[in-house]
Amino acid sequence: MNKYELIQDTFHMLQREISPDTGIRLNMPCEEAEEMASLLLEYGLPALRTTRLLSIYIAIKLALLRHSECDNALNGEKLTRSVLDGDYLYSFYVQLCLQWNEHDLLVRLAPVIKQIQIRRIEGASYDDALLRCWELFLEMEEGHVRKSCAI
């Protein structure tokens, strides 16, 4: 499987997992997931787990993107929708981690995501922090590194 097939399979999986009642469209550019897809493929994980991990990553990225739309939302309805979608997607990634028994990942991601949110409020960049945390998690899981994901 190449990274583009992985991304496509992942979006299909996410579409099945997300409640249609939310009205949330999974309209993230594929480019946003390419680096993570490549990283996951490097580790030779089973295909299902690779797709699940990328699903969790995409849910987080979508939440970050939705909340970043709040900066440009001038009217109340669009602002409300961006906040609610982002909040739902943050809880959705937690749900996916629990559903797929990715407890160690959840423990590592939660503080980093909170740090990213704080940095964004302060106007700082977060681009590499999330991917770096994932990389450390995958290395730790493979037994290479025993580091914290703290940024």
Regions found by a protein language model. Give the residues of each.
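Mg2+-dependent prenyl diphosphate-binding active-site environment of isoprenoid biosynthetic enzymes
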Residues: 7-151
